[in-house]
UniProtKB/Swiss-Prot annotation:
GO cellular component: cell projection; cytoskeleton; cytosol; nucleus; plasma membrane
Spans annotated as Required for phospholipid binding and regulation of the substrate preference: 1207-1230
Record's keyword terms, sorted: Cell membrane, Cell projection, Cytoplasm, Cytoskeleton, GTP-binding, GTPase activation, Lipid-binding, Membrane, Nucleotide-binding, Nucleus, Repeat
Domain pG1 pseudoGTPase span(s) in chain numbering: 587-762
Compositional bias per record (Low complexity), positions renumbered to this chain: 1120-1133
CDD domains, per the entry: pseudoGTPaseD_p190RhoGAP-A, Ras_like_GTPase, RhoGAP_p190
UniProt keyword Lipid biosynthesis present: no
Official protein name in the record: Rho GTPase-activating protein 35
The encoding gene: arhgap35
Comp. bias (Pro residues): 1441-1462
Residue numbers binding GTP: 28, 33-37, 52, 56, 95-97, 201-203, 229-231
Length: 1477
């Protein structure tokens, strides 16, 4: 409706006349009442179009111009409005005024000569071509403004705005103005036109004037008053709109808003517009270098800009822009200033870093000092104009600091802070040094003492003032590391000083509790032992590590590694000797790989042909860019036959590929491996025990999806797991038809064999007397690792110009041509460390020893004593004491050790020499007496060595089951890491076909009868000991029964054993003249003949101290020859006695028997047997019966005497004959122990659990039964149950998973043992191997809270099945430990019983041996803190020392008794009642 009216009806137009006080200055004062400003603001409201100055004093020309047009009124134009009633209208505005002549200051004469009051009330205005008025500047320049004429030159006035100025006008009286307005109102009232009174200049209004104006309006009828301010644009439109509404009665009336309320609304509108404009400016203007012209052009189209300019004008908008730019500039300057000030400390640090240089200087002097520094211009810049913030430098990319900045207060404050920092740093360093000194001097700070215990002894208020707690802890941690490392070094030195004790105890890889207790007792009073009392685990680890070094001495296990003497000597000799690497190049074993291929039905030959096809023409194979000679030995028949033997005199295997394509061929592989390993037990070199195996499934068709193939794969994996070998499914790799294996797999296998070959040191053989063809004498020079002497000085005395590398010796061997006696002789000098010399002492022929020791080091002399204890007195010894200077300057310790060394030399009738270091070296002639003595005893030494080797080679080799360290714990070490015993003679490679062996084994029968294969580990002593499953012994030949327990096989697990060393002290030497070949009985299996033809002749030593031998003959068989050798008459005791009395050559003894200073710990050798209860299994602890020993015929006697051509040497050899005690052959356990096949036990966890039932049924039943009936059983899990009952329980459960344990009436210990057996038989331990290392690292964290949290996080990484079962078992053990007052099973005791079962570490590595203590404490921690780890509870409070519960977590299980923590997991589980699981 409204829109239609807008379209149909013309917009109404009204003419309004604005009137008010006008006239000369006398009448109106110096300024008008604001009529022009009111009209200007209404017609042109924009701030830029509003002008405050509108003069009424005009020149005649201006008055006559077209704008004024000789009239006393101005036409302001028209303005369109949209009032509240939404009806548009137009208003023509006319201002009635009175122009004054600028010459006469009188009103201009116009066409209307009426006075202003009459003229202003006129309703008809006419002025032809009169132009619209803008401002005063328009007059005379009309062409520069818009020219718009008054419509039709005439207007009819519709209403009047009566203006009253309520400001304090100059030279104007308000009352006079009010009288004038009153008259004017009276005149206008006559016109009957609407009228509104407008109060102008209210922004400067006077309250009285406003009040009077309102009073005036009240006296008039219907005279409305509007308060306005044209300058502030307040109520201007309201005044005109109100008048229009009076003119047009149809329009609604607007509310008259008081001035101050309207001003508030206008101010809010302006403020909002200003905020928006400022936001626009901040968004557009980002740089202080912006100009208004550019910015104004970019903002023209923005509504925010337009609104603000309309309200406030461009000038104010520009002003705000400049304010913003100035603010940006200041911010930029402040940023630069801040950067300069932040860089100033660094500048000071680079130019004046020392406090002493500036400590007492003022800032001004320091500023001058900086200018004199050479690096000044790199940091500062001197500007030509200052200050820098008013120069262009503020926009420069130069980062240097303006030099005039240093004159500011801020720079002085920075300097003061820098100076204070230096002073504080100096003070903190002083406090740190003081704190460190306090730690060093404090007697309360011992290795391993926690910070919480130490702080009360060392802290003071001054320390707390200057240093923070983390700083103390860091210093304390570093100090602890230093003193711990020092204590460990000193403790290691202590262990070396007690070398005699370790060698006398004959320790092996798993020492007994008894022997460990001896070590504790002997070392317990030493201060260096007590220093590690808070680090018992580390101390135990050091002892175990040292035992490992004694048991397996190499360069890697040497405590001085990498500064081992062997390494140093090799480097020195390589640089001195000519062609040092030639002999390595000539060694045929260095680049040779011997590979056995085992497989029946042609599999071995086919694979050998395939591999040869991949080789070059000369059987060379390239691996990683290096050429290797590949020697293949395919075997398809009975491995007991010599033709199918794994090892021959010329072929020593480095690995074996086992091929199968059926159950029968797999059975053949297993049976062959078993036979080979059994036969190797009797060999001095039992490398076949640890021969690397690879089991390969051959399937030419590549079919792996069939049921048969899947079954073969599963069986192969089980066999590989039990044999601890690699399983390779060659068919699954996508081979082509007709091929068994690809080149990539061959390379992978050969790389593994090379690594095993290096680790097992299977290259090189022990030289015998025949190795001495290029030299006449072999001398061993023994040097102590870590002795403070220069090896170069020692070697300088050996005529280095004569060095030549030995062709058959070791890395430290050289040849010397020396004049000894009447001619020049060739001598091989082996320069070795003591630990390498121990092996040489037994395994190689040595004519003499040159033993060096440092006079000031006790450990050096102790090692010398330990070494000499086992040397025969027929071997000459040269003792050389190394000193650091003249004797007069030596310390007391060095003097004492020099004296002791000289006394030892006198007692053993050896040579003694003092060799000062760093001085002129003595000539080689000083060793001439020693070499002469060696030459004189050469014959007797070689004869003795020949007899030792022959006797050992002919003895029953099953002695391997006794302690491998009978004579010396170093006999099985590798020297240096590469030496082995000689290749066995051909007679060792002959096997006899026994009826009981040729018959298929039980395992073979089971393999043929069933599809499922289940094997027990063959050489895993740890697992077998935990399960306590000892197989029934096989009956060997001869018929005297012997048994061997599975734990004894641990001696065969390590690859470091090269044979059993016999103690020289246990050998009885018969007199020379009483010698008869028949007096010596040796096994007939050492003779080269088939075993099925040998005689069952054995001899048993009887009263060996008297040299008597009783011969036992086999009466069922005739002698192999017709001689009378070996008859009873030949063994007449009286003849032996007479022969002893007539003896010329006495038997050799050990030096320990000739010198009281040697063997001071020998009492432990007799009091502690090697096969003590802790070291042997329960079966071997039985009394070992003496085996029989048969005599040999003349043919056997001559077999080893015929090689000795020298009659003199032969006679001496006869004189050195001695009885050899034979240990009875012991059967090796069969691979097939199990008598029943389980479909539950021994399977992976994933196959016995489900998502609905994550705990195996068997575990649930056992735990429920134990918790219901056995929580108070004393020693539960420690006391083992009956083995047969445990097997019965497992067998019955296999048949019925719903077995009721209560109904069957099993004992608690039986159920507990079966529970542990379940975990022991798992293919992988419950705690995965890959998590065990991470758990050990987490346990090493010192902070308890962090340790627990780290271990808790690691639990989340467990496989789901393992985690759930581990949680279940640990929770059960935690509940068991809560009854420890009754069952005596604390969390510590439970952890000792369970950690080997749950973790099953590999005890063939030193890391596992030394980590056993940590493993146990980890399981103990899990049990003790079970609520925290699994049930989101807080950690359990640490128990007090007196509490019977678990010990503190920081050291969960410190030993409470003198013996150290045992290493072997099986030993740690031995109960008090009996030593079985």
């Amino acid at each position: 409706m409204m829109m239609a009216r807008k379209q149909d009806v013309r917009v109404p137009t009204y003419s309004i006349s604005v009137v008010g006080l006008s006239g000369t200055e006398k009448e109106k004062g110096q300024c008008g009442v604001g009529k022009s400003c009111l009209c200007n603001r209404f017609v042109r409201p924009s701030a830029d179009d509003f002008h405050l100055d509108h003069t009424s004093v005009l020149s005649t020309s201006d008055f006559g111009g077209r704008v004024v047009n000789n009239d006393h009124f101005l036409y302001w134009g028209e303005s369109g409005q949209m009032p509240e009633d939404c009806v548009d209208f137009k208003v023509h505005v006319v201002e009635q005024t009175e122009f004054i002549d600028d010459q006469t200051f009188q009103p201009h004469r116009s066409t209307a000569l009426q006075p202003y009051i009459k003229r202003a009330a006129s309703c008809k205005l006419a002025s032809a071509e009169k132009l619209m008025y803008f401002c005063t500047d328009q007059l005379g320049l009309e062409q520069d403004f818009e020219q718009k004429q008054m419509p039709e030159g005439k207007l009819l006035i519709d209403g009047f705005l009566l203006c009253i100025d309520v400001s304090r006008g100059m030279n104007r009286n308000f009352d006079d103005q009010l009288k004038f307005v009153s008259n004017l109102y009276t005149q206008m009232a006559k016109t009957k036109k609407p009228m509104v009174m407008v109060l102008t200049k209210c922004d400067e209004g006077v309250e009285r004037y406003i009040r009077d104006a309102h009073s005036f309006a009240l006296n008039k009828k219907n005279l409305q008053v509007v308060e306005t301010s044209a300058r502030s644009n307040v109520n201007v439109d309201l005044a005109f709109t109100t008048l229009v509404q009076l003119i047009d009665k149809s329009r609604g009336k607007s509310k008259i808003i008081p001035y101050f309320e309207a001003l508030k609304q206008q101010s809010q509108l302006i403020a909002a517009a200003k905020d928006k404009y400022e936001w626009l400016v901040s968004r557009v203007v980002k740089s202080h270098n912006e100009t208004w012209i550019n910015v104004n052009r970019r903002m023209q189209s923005s509504i925010e800009y337009q609104d603000y300019v309309h309200l406030e004008g461009t000038d104010k908008a520009k002003k705000l822009f400049h304010q913003h730019v100035q603010r940006l500039k200041q911010e930029h300057i402040e940023r630069r200033r801040k950067n300069y000030l932040s860089a100033l400390p660094r500048a000071l640090e680079s130019l004046v870093p020392e406090l002493d240089e500036i400590d007492r200087l003022s800032w001004v002097k320091v500023s001058n000092l900086l200018e004199s520094k050479a690096e000044f211009l790199k940091v500062f810049i001197v500007l030509e104009e200052t200050p820098w913030e008013f120069t262009n430098h503020i926009d420069s990319i130069d980062e240097r600091i303006p030099y005039d900045l240093l004159e500011t207060v801020s720079a002085a404050e920075v300097y003061a802070s820098y100076l204070e920092k230096l002073r504080n740093a100096r003070k903190k360093e002083e406090m740190k040094r003081s704190f460190k000194d306090n730690l060093i001097t404090s007697p309360f700070i011992t290795p391993g003492k926690p910070w919480e215990e130490a702080r009360s002894f060392i802290m003071s208020e001054e320390f707390y003032q200057w240093l923070e707690e983390p700083v103390y802890m860091e210093i304390y941690s570093r100090h602890q590391k230093e003193i711990i490392d020092k204590a460990k070094e000193e403790f290691q030195e202590l262990l070396l000083e007690y070398s005699e004790l370790f060698y006398e105890l004959e320790l092996d890889a798993k020492p007994s509790k008894e022997k460990m207790g001896v070590i504790q007792d002997v070392l317990g009073e030493e201060q260096r032992f007590k220093a590690l009392q808070k680090l018992q685990a580390e101390r135990d680890a050091l002892i175990l590590k040292h035992i490992h070094f004694v048991y397996h001495p190499t360069k890697d296990t040497c405590p001085s590694n990498p500064s081992c003497v062997d390494t140093k000597i090799e480097h020195i000799l390589c640089s001195r000797c000519t062609y040092p690497y030639d002999r390595l190049q000539k060694d045929p074993n260095v680049d040779r790989i011997n590979l056995v291929i085992l497989g029946r039905d042609g599999l071995a030959r086919e694979l050998a042909n395939e591999i040869r096809a991949l080789c070059t023409n000369d059987d060379k194979y390239v691996i990683d860019g290096k050429m290797y000679e590949l020697s293949l030995r395919p075997i398809e028949g009975n491995v007991r036959l010599p033709v199918n033997s794994f090892q021959t005199s010329t072929f020593q295997p480095h690995g074996c590929l086992c091929l199968y394509n059926s159950k029968e061929s797999l059975s053949y592989v297993v049976e062959s491996i078993e036979k080979s390993r059994e036969s190797s037990l009797g060999r001095k070199e039992n490398h076949l025990i640890n021969l690397p195996l690879t089991l390969i499934l051959v399937n030419r068709r590549g079919d792996t999806s069939s049921e048969t193939a899947h079954s073969l794969i599963q069986h192969g994996q089980q066999v590989a797991s039990k044999l601890q070998c690699v399983f390779l499914d060659a068919a699954s790799t996508g081979l082509g038809y007709g091929r068994n294996i690809n080149e990539k797999q061959i390379s992978l296998i050969l790389r593994g064999l090379l690594e095993s070959k290096r680790n097992l040191n299977l290259v090189g053989s022990t030289p015998s007397i025949k190795d001495l063809t290029d030299c006449e004498l072999r001398i061993v020079m023994c040097l102590m690792c870590a002795d403070l002497f220069n090896i170069e000085d020692v070697l300088n005395a050996l005529k280095p110009h004569t060095y030549r590398p030995s062709q058959c010796g070791l890395g430290g061997s050289v040849l010397l041509d020396l004049p000894i006696g009447s001619q020049k002789r060739r001598l091989e000098l082996m320069m070795l460390s003591y630990h390498s010399s121990f092996n040489v002492r037994k395994t190689r022929l040595v004519h003499g020893y040159m033993i060096f020791y440092a006079a000031k080091r006790r450990a050096s002399l102790a090692m010398l004593r330990a070494f000499l204890c086992e040397v025969q007195d027929i071997v000459p010894v040269q003792i050389v004491a190394l000193t650091e200077g003249p004797l007069t300057f030596l310390e007391n310790v060095a003097r004492e050790q020099l004296q002791e060394g000289e006394e030892i030399a006198q007692d053993i009738e050896g040579k003694f020499l003092i060799l000062p270091q760093g001085q002129t070296q003595p000539k080689f002639d000083v060793f001439y007496p020693f070499f002469k003595d060696v030459l004189e005893k050469k014959v007797i030494i070689e004869a003795s060595h020949m007899y030792d080797n022959t006797a050992e080679a002919c003895s029953t080799t099953e002695e391997v089951f006794s302690s491998p360290r009978a004579g010396s714990p170093l006999c099985n070490s590798h020297l240096p890491d590469s030496e082995e015993d000689p290749e066995p003679s051909p007679q060792h490679l002959l096997f006899r076909e026994e009826p009981n062996i040729s018959v298929p084994t039980k395992f073979t029968r089971e393999l043929e009868e069933t599809e499922n294969l289940h094997f027990i580990p063959m050489i895993n002593p740890l697992e077998s000991k935990f399960n306590n499953k000892v197989p029934p012994p096989l009956k060997p030949k001869p018929p005297i029964p012997y048994e061997i327990s599975k734990p004894e096989l641990s001696y065969l697990d390590t690859g470091s054993r090269d044979g059993h060393r016999k103690s020289l002290t246990s050998i009885n030497w018969p007199p020379l003249e009483a010698f008869d070949p028949s007096d010596y009985a040796e096994p007939m299996d050492s003779v080269v003949k088939p075993r099925n033809q040998e005689e069952n002749i054995y001899s048993v030593p009887h009263d060996s101290t008297q040299g008597k031998i009783i011969t036992i003959r086999n009466t069922n068989k005739p002698q192999s020859n017709g001689s009378g050798n070996g008859s009873d008459s030949d063994m007449d005791t009286n003849s032996l006695e007479r022969a002893r009395k007539a003896s010329i050559v006495t038997k050799p003894v050990l030096y320990r028997t000739k010198c009281a200073k040697l063997g001071k710990f020998s009492s432990y050798r007799s009091s502690l047997s090697v096969g003590s209860d802790d070291e042997l299994g329960p079966i071997q602890r039985k009394e070992v019966e003496t085996g029989t020993q048969g005599t040999k015929g003349d043919n056997t006697t001559n077999s080893y005497e015929a090689d000795v051509e020298d009659p003199r040497k032969r006679n001496i050899l006869r004189s050195l004959r001695r009885t050899t005690k034979k240990v009875k052959p012991k059967p090796r356990p069969s691979l097939t122990k199990a008598t029943w096949e389980s479909n539950y036990f021994g399977y992976p966890l994933s196959s016995v659990v489900t998502s609905e039932r994550p705990i195996p049924v068997f575990i649930e039943k056992c735990v429920e039964y134990i918790e219901a009936t056995g929580m108070t059983t004393e020693g539960i899990y420690r006391v083992s149950g009956n083995k047969s009952e445990m097997d019965s329980l497992q067998r019955q459960f296999d048949q019925d998973h719903n077995l009721d344990l209560v109904e069957k009436d099993f004992t608690v210990n039986t159920v507990a043992g079966a529970l542990k057996s379940f975990f022991s038989e798992l293919p992988d331990p419950l705690v995965p191997y890959n998590m065990q290392t991470e758990l050990v690292e987490a346990y090493k964290i010192n902070d308890l809270e962090q340790k627990l949290q780290a271990m808790k996080e690691l639990l989340k990484k467990f496989p789901k099945e393992n985690h759930e079962i581990f949680k279940y078992v640990i929770s059960h053990l935690n509940r068991v430990s809560q009854h420890h007052h009754v069952n005596l099973m604390t969390s510590e005791n439970l952890s000792i019983c369970f950690w080997p079962t749950l973790m099953r570490p590999d005890f063939t590595t030193m890391d596992a041996l030394t980590a056993t203590r940590t493993y146990q404490t980890i399981i103990e921690l899990f049990i003790h803190q079970c609520p925290f780890f699994f049930y989101q509870r807080l950690p359990v409070d640490l128990p007090t020392p007196s509490s019977p519960s678990t010990p503190p977590l920081t050291q969960p299980s410190p030993p409470q008794s003198p013996p150290l923590t045992p290493v072997s997991p099986s030993l740690s589980l031995l109960p008090a009642e009996h030593n079985i699981l």
